[in-house]
Structure formats: structure tokens, C-alpha cells
Amino acid sequence: PNFDGITLHVAELGSEILEHCKKLKVISRHGVGYDNLDTKYLKKNNITLLITATANAVSVAEHVMYMMLSLSKGITEYDNAVRSGNFKKNVNKIETYELLNKEILIAGFGRIGKNLIKRCLGFEMKVNVYDPFVDKKTIELMGGNKVENINTALKTADFLSIHMPLTSETKNLIDLKKLKTMKKNAVIINTARGGIINETDLDTALNNKIIFGAGLDVFEKEPINMDNPLIKNKRVLLSPHSSTFTQECTARMGIETVQNLIDFFENKIKKNMIIKL
């Protein structure tokens, strides 16, 4: 093939395909993740990788808020109660919480984390941020408190929202050992990448009421296997990696994907759109 650039959504692009693209200079990804690409091949062959760095932050941050509110307010249980005719019966036994004065730990303070903190502060939450790559002043100027040790911060967190890439360092970062240190009313939200939370350990923690609940938009294997125990766990709120599927975000991502390609060939691509391989 004689093309110079590719726009890529969810298709897998391995070296067995890329090696036929002799003129390829750039791949513009429709999204921010690139698990579906052979990045070693791209680096070896000096192929630039671009992402839609700014398009999805609001949509994902709102999705986190939706999951936090749904879990803490018992939305699923209340909805089921009304639909099953139990308008009053036992609904006062459903355990619910306010967000006011609750402590959230935002793990990863990139574009999404920075959009999330504004929404959490609007609910008058206390915000701790764990990100070794972001300085204390930046976090404090946005109203957060920088924490240096994630293990210590987990012990007091009412909510944990994960916004890290999946790497060898973050794989199974949240395991049973860490979950056992958290509060019994704690809720974990993951809209980043599956595999950062050990799913077997999370299921165990929820079944044994070690923590209160979890909201997952991403999974170690996608689509999630139907025999995954989390499917039947009523203490988990699930969505199919859909936190960016708002009408507005979809439009922004499409435009940004194409614009990045144009900007690259016109030598005016913004640095934050380029992934360092």
C-alpha cells in the first residue's frame, strides 16, 4: 500500500500488517489508548503515533461521577424496588451515602483527572491526587492535595478513581492486599484500562464486604467473558468501555483524529497529541 498515514479506531495493527506499509509515516488514533498497536514496530521504523488527547476528558470525568453517584445512592436497587412493586418495603435498608466531605483519591492526574477534580470539588469532596509525574503546586492550584504514597492514601479513601495507563508497573496494582487496607464503605472506579485492578481479588473483596462497591468501564479481557464472576456480582456497576460514547465526545474525537493527521503533514501538530514511543 502506498499511503502515508492511517486513522485507526479499534482494529488491531500488528507488525505483520504494518511491514507492508512501506511509506507509512504516521498513525492517528481515534482515542487515547494504543493497546491495539505494535508500538515497538512503530518506534523501530520511526512511525509517529498521534492520539485524540483532549477530546474525551469531559465525557470520561462525567462517567466517573455517574458511577460514583449511582453506587453511593443505590440507584440500581431503588429502581428495581419500584419496578418490582416494593415501593416502600425494605428500601430504607438499602445502604447509601452522600458525597459531601468524602475523600476521593484520583490516581493519575492527566487530562481526565484534571477534569474530574473540578467536578468532585463541586460536590464538596476532599481530593487527594497520586501522580509521581505531576508537581505539588499544579495539584494544589486545582484544589487537590498531592500524596506521595498510594498505599497510605488508600487507607483513608472513600473513593478511588483510576486514570493510569496499563504498564508492567501498574498491572494488578490494586490487589487483595491493598483492598484489605481500604475502608468498608470504599468504592473503586476504573475507566482507564483493565488489568490495573486484579479482577479476581476485586470479586473476593466485594463478596466479603471488604469494600462497598466498584464501577468498571474497562476489563482485563474485552469483551468481558460471560463467566467472569463480576458479571453476577451485584456490588459492581458495569459499562462496556463506553465512557467516551457521548454524542459530543464522539464528534470531537472524529474531528480531532482527522485534524491531527492534517496537522502532522502541515508540520503544526501539537506536542500533546504525540505519543513518545
Task: Report residues per predicted region.
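N-terminal glycine-/charge-rich "phosphate-binding" loop or analogous flexible N-terminal tail
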Residues: P1-G5, E124, K137, F265, ...
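An N-terminal-biased, well-structured beta-alpha scaffold segment characteristic
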Residues: P1-L50, K155, D175-K177
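Short beta->alpha connector loops at strand-helix junctions that form conserved
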Residues: H9, H30-G31, N46-V58, I150, ...
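Rossmann-like adenosine-cofactor binding region
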Residues: E12-L18, V134-P229
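Phosphate-coordination loops involved in phosphoryl transfer and adenosine-cofactor binding
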Residues: L24, L100-E103, L176, N185
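Phosphate-binding beta-alpha-beta segment of Rossmann-like dinucleotide-binding domains, i.e.
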Residues: I47, A53-E103, N115-K118
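Rossmann-like dinucleotide-binding domain for NAD(H)/NADP(H)
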Residues: L49, N185-L277
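Glycine-rich Rossmann-fold phosphate-binding loop(s) that bind the pyrophosphate
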Residues: F109-G110
